[in-house]
């Protein structure tokens, strides 16, 4: 008879399980610059958060306003569509408006079909952008495609701009795909069509990067992406791509969708890759709800990186989901109120209180886990549940400090949080690991 080992017995020579993401894959460092600001993608730099406007770029005022909103939300690079002469003509004006507002976030021009013409005809547009996104699948076919691609790379070299070669399965080079399918038909054991498509995406990205280098673009001025809209395909494509090259990689699940579906799908795909050390910059391609806030994609990107422990952007609130023990929705309202308060304060706190972005706050709804979670947090409050004494103890750095009662618990706790931030981080005390 076999017996299971008693898990309470100490193990000789046992090591604790590894915690944390795998080491980042080694990539070249690409510098995206504007004014006095440099955002490094790849190398040893942190994973960069990107976003994209959905305004008509020909409307310079609306586009500049949205770029500012995205930058203030935390986007470190913002991409804008450049699809018409009218749009290209306004890019320099958008850049000028942003500079006047003190917004030095680098702009990336997103080009399809006619980018070679627009960059050539509007040199002020080419200069005002910090980076170009090129989709080799939307540049025509045969020699025309090669000439158009070469023309865009020549402009990038002339203006010393980095380029993202972004391949998308919705616009994959038809000639390349046909060739890959033909090669597959001659295999002893042909691959399924989806596998051929994934291979074609990777081949397209890398071969175009090599061609760009042959045309004179520096290897440290190239970023690659291969976007698909299915989670498992994206994971497989980027694993393959990362194994075949050392260019920095831009991650994103294209057409992720709306609301919770888009957030869940993007998180499921990107979290796996980031955990494996793959990915140097990310963008969450959410379809906004009607009248929704475009900055939502920035917040989701930040939350993915922060919850994985890869970066810290804003203090995070831990809150219980609620159950039959919680007597009201007050703790939920308080958790939401505190998280919103923390985000509102971050533009000021980021410069005044270094390290505050790593602070953890707990807002709990009953005695079961409330005191424990509150002690684990930097600062926490445990609200009373059903049948409990109507009092809310506050814990600071693991110690119970004060008990709040009455109708003004929310206001009093917010004031305690603000005082704690000023005392702890204003004194230059770093966040405890």
Swiss-Prot record:
[4Fe-4S] cluster binds at residues 320, 323, 366, 373. Pfam families: GcpE. Its cofactor is [4Fe-4S] cluster. It comes from the Bacteria. It catalyses: (2E)-4-hydroxy-3-methylbut-2-enyl diphosphate + oxidized [flavodoxin] + H2O + 2 H(+) = 2-C-methyl-D-erythritol 2,4-cyclic diphosphate + reduced [flavodoxin]. Residues 1-24 are annotated as: Disordered. One of its GO terms (molecular function) is 4 iron, 4 sulfur cluster binding. The keyword Metal-binding applies. Binds 1 [4Fe-4S] cluster. Residues 1-10 have a biased composition (Polar residues). GO terms for biological process: isopentenyl diphosphate biosynthetic process, methylerythritol 4-phosphate pathway; terpenoid biosynthetic process. The keyword Metal-binding applies. Keywords: 4Fe-4S, Iron, Iron-sulfur, Isoprene biosynthesis, Metal-binding, Oxidoreductase. Pathway: Isoprenoid biosynthesis; isopentenyl diphosphate biosynthesis via DXP pathway; isopentenyl diphosphate from 1-deoxy-D-xylulose 5-phosphate: step 5/6. Its EC number is 1.17.7.3. Gene3D superfamilies: Dihydropteroate synthase-like (3.20.20.20), Sulfite Reductase Hemoprotein, domain 1 (3.30.413.10). Belongs to the IspG family. Converts 2C-methyl-D-erythritol 2,4-cyclodiphosphate (ME-2,4cPP) into 1-hydroxy-2-methyl-2-(E)-butenyl 4-diphosphate. This is 4-hydroxy-3-methylbut-2-en-1-yl diphosphate synthase (flavodoxin).
